[in-house]
């Protein structure tokens, strides 16, 4: 027996480390239906969470709900040695559904990255609720699914992931004011911009808990991910380039959708992603849109089939049909799967270096040249992806190790100087050189190309497409000569 134990120990020492997907499967195990139910039960207990309801009543209204969410974040932070920074950000708005200036407050927790604290991935859900009349701030509006389910996913993600450390930063956000005009999304997007965050992805969870539609159709095996095609921020400048070079289906948000689709397939949790190629549902909107308007990659995650009898409805029964967004309509097994997908995505994106910024050349040539920046030292390799122009998913990739990229080059930088007796002295700095891959006998016309970054542990970023506006940072128009 002693020899067997010793041999087993030696085998473990020499064993390969778990794959990234194996790590993600282990991370999502603690996601709890019971905890998700507890969160929604508590949210429902506040009666209404309408944006215009009381912000000071300790038991009823939006203020009580925000205070409770803040206390939950605080509790999770205490359990992980104060690993979360719990914060609020507020702005005052007025509009069609805000007849008087109203303070909009988002409550969120920041889990700062150990290596790249400015690279940020955000999960968010709106905590406010409503009934039929969007201005009715007094009637009970349980909002169990819209958007108690998304808020529950945010809090559960914080509970589960705060037990781990990640190179990048994760932000868990509960937003106020969505039903009155996406004001919570605007507030947090403005905060992210003011902080100078490099927002890699925003996962907006809105209505993720019901599995049966108002027509009786049920589907607990799919999640819809909605994403914009051409990026909205910078659209006026990018339109002519996109018309010539393509990219209608390759915004950063669309590549987040592809990333989630592939992740769901690999996790094997009984949930498949159905990519919806729209910014949001037909003639509707969500809190990811203000992020898109500022140039941050964002997508909406939602149920496969909506039930319109259960959202934005007064609590009532008519002709034998029950209306209202009550907790008995939530499918908690389905909500747990949706939450696991989010948790895995957050962990994966926070573990990977941010996507590079690729460019492609190959006009009037039988070969294609793909180049990209190698700005993040955490990237140990890159994958150069391609797919046919009419294909949805990335089809094939070639790996380029960072050691195959050019070494940093010493260059003279007039902007950097050391003061001397005779004035400023120009000094040299190390400048990173672009990586390059030449694809022989691959015609640029027939393919879309992209590049992802891979960490030393094998975690891969979403793919950034080599198209106009394909980079994962806000678009900056070139200076006109």
Question: What is each PLM-predicted segment?
Answer:
Residues 44, 208-229, 275-353:
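Active-site-adjacent mobile loop/cap segments within catalytic or ligand-binding domains
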Residues 109, 123, 127-129, 133-182, ...:
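Alpha-helical metal-binding/catalytic segments enriched in His/Glu/Asp
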Residues 407, 413, 439-460:
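Beta-strand-rich modules
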């Amino acid at each position: 027996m002693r020899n067997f134990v010793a041999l087993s120990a030696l085998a473990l020492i020499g064993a390969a480390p778990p794959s990234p997907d194996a790590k993600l499967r282990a991370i999502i195990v603690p996601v709890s239906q019971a905890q998700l139910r507890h969160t929604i039960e508590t949210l429902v207990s506040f009666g209404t969470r309408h944006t215009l309801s009381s912000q000071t009543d300790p038991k009823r209204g939006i203020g009580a709900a925000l205070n409770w969410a803040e206390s939950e974040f605080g509790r999770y932070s205490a359990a992980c040695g104060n690993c979360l920074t719990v914060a609020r950000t507020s702005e005052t708005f007025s509009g069609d559904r805000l007849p008087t200036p109203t303070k909009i407050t988002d409550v969120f927790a920041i889990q700062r990255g150990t290596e790249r604290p400015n690279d940020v991935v955000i999960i968010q859900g709106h905590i406010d609720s409503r009934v039929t009349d969007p201005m009715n701030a007094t009637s009970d509006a349980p909002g169990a699914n819209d958007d108690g389910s998304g808020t529950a996913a945010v809090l559960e993600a914080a509970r589960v992931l705060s037990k781990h450390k990640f190179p990048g930063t994760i932000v868990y956000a509960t937003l106020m004011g969505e039903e009155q005009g996406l004001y919570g999304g605007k507030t947090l997007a403005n905060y992210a911009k003011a902080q100078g965050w490099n927002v890699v992805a925003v996962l907006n969870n809105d209505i993720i808990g019901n599995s049966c539609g108002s027509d009786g159709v049920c589907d607990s095996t799919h999640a819809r991910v909605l994403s914009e095609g051409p990026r909205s921020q910078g659209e006026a400048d990018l339109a002519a380039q996109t018309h010539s070079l393509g990219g209608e289906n390759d915004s950063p948000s669309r590549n987040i959708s592809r990333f989630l689709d592939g992740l769901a397939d690999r996790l094997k949790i009984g949930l498949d992603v159905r990519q919806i190629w729209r910014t949001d549902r037909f003639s509707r909107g969500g809190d990811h849109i203000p992020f898109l308007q500022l140039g941050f990659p964002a997508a909406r995650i939602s149920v496969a089939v909506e039930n319109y009898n259960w959202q934005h409805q007064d609590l009532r029964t008519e002709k034998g049909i029950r209306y209202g967004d009550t907790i008995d309509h939530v499918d908690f097994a389905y909500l747990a799967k949706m939450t696991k997908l989010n948790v895995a995505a957050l962990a994966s994106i926070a573990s990977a270096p941010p996507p590079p910024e690729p460019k492609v050349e190959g006009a009037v040539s039988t070969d294609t040249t793909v180049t990209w920046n190698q700005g993040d030292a955490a990237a140990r390799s890159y994958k150069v992806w391609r797919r046919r122009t009419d294909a949805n998913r990335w089809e094939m990739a070639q790996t380029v190790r960072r050691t195959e990229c050019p070494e940093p080059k010493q260059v003279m930088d007039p902007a950097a100087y050391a003061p001397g007796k005779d004035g400023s002295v120009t000094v040299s700095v190390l400048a990173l050189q672009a990586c390059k891959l030449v694809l022989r006998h691959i015609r640029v016309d027939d393919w879309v190309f992209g590049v992802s970054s891979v960490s030393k542990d094998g975690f891969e970023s979403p793919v950034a497409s080599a198209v106009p506006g394909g980079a994962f940072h806000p678009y900056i128009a070139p200076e006109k000569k």
